[in-house]
Amino acid sequence: MQTDNTKSNTNKTAKQEWGSFAFVICIALLIRILIMEPFTVPTGSMKATILENDYIFSTKYSYGYSNYSLSFFDFIPLFKGRIFAREPERGDIVVFRPPNDMNVRYIKRLIGLPGDKIQLIDDVIYINDKKIERTEVGTYISEEGIKYLKFKETLPNGRTYFSYKLAPIFGVIYNDRYGNTDVFYVPEGKYFFLGDNRDQSNDSRVNLGFVPFENFIAKAQFIWLSTKITWWDNDIGVINLVLKLKPWIESVRLNRIFRNLYSTDE
């Protein structure tokens, strides 16, 4: 009889533990789906605001919810448009699905709102025929030793941020077609994005085009971790992952941890 009671108590405890574990998993999934989601940035299109292998904390609720912003369900057409929608602001850094490749995620700065007229002339942004404030404030040398000119830009709503342009080499300007564009008329329900790394960004000036509001996933807020190298790789196997762990930890950029993406402090 004592043995049966012991088994019963053990089974009850195991069920309680599994129930608690399942509850925690459900809460974590709900947080990721509805509140926040971490992203890793693989490219330098937002350099030096965001570097390769920056780990970004983003808020899912900032713009409401669409089929594309609901993690794990974005492949199911649950509904169209957005629910609990909040209007994005000029200068926001947004994670979104590019309309020409729904299998990836981009992160760019929102420059043009629906109805805007956008053009770049000599690298200066013109919004509705008015140029934004743009001042050269210094230079930036990347980890690869590449020199960039650093500019402080101010949008019409007062949002300020830094943009970067490859420094001329022997007087030659790199990729000048990015700095002098056609006129873009932003359609209703769509937005115009630029990368802060102006010469090395696939954005609304080139292949990306305009981005529908429905494609917005989250608003990027701050960097919670940053490393010089990537650790996880599905192709290298468990042993190599273990061997790579130490150099990955040693590559952490301590000065970037918990950096606010909207701060213009030097």
UniProtKB/Swiss-Prot annotation:
Residues 42-266 are periplasmic. This is Signal peptidase I. It comes from the Bacteria. Residues 1-20 are cytoplasmic. It comes from Rickettsia felis (strain ATCC VR-1525 / URRWXCal2). Belongs to the peptidase S26 family. The keyword Ubl conjugation does not apply. It is a single-pass type II membrane protein. It catalyses: Cleavage of hydrophobic, N-terminal signal or leader sequences from secreted and periplasmic proteins.
